[in-house]
Amino acid sequence: SCRDADRISMKRDEILKRLGFGIPHASRIRVIVCSDLKNEADDQYAVIHHLLSPSEEICGIVACHFEWFSRRVQQQTPIGEQWPFVKEDAEILRSRRGKTMEMSFAEGKKLLALAGIDDVPLLRGSPSEIEGHDGMFSEGAEFIVHEAMKDDPRPLYVCCLGAITDLAIAYKMQP
């Protein structure tokens, strides 16, 4: 068992060098990973895979919401007629409304700490889906725009492992 005090924190490049991976900076693709880390169990593995892929320069991770289902449940009446789960399950989904992005953010902090990676920014995404109006903002969307506008000859890829809300907001901010 490993105590927190025993953990080594290091830069991502240091980890890749220890693993024997060395790809020139100019050959690495720029990637922002958007993930609803707390929604499904596979997202943590996918994010770590990106972080340890030597061909990628991970610019940042955006913690995304997973709100669509709880909103759908909220709109259904009566619950049992159209959904295969019981009322208690629907109540759990309703209780998460507006909180899922923060759940993903906390999971992202935990994941980076467990991996010992301290140089990849973790940003908060939108707390919910877009409801058709302008003016939505998220730290993650602002980061996407900032990275996209950088003077860098390499293209920027945004890998969405969950909701595309922050990418849509970024596009609305800077088409």
Where are these regions (language model features)?
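N-terminal acidic, glycine/proline-rich low-complexity segments
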Residues: 2-175
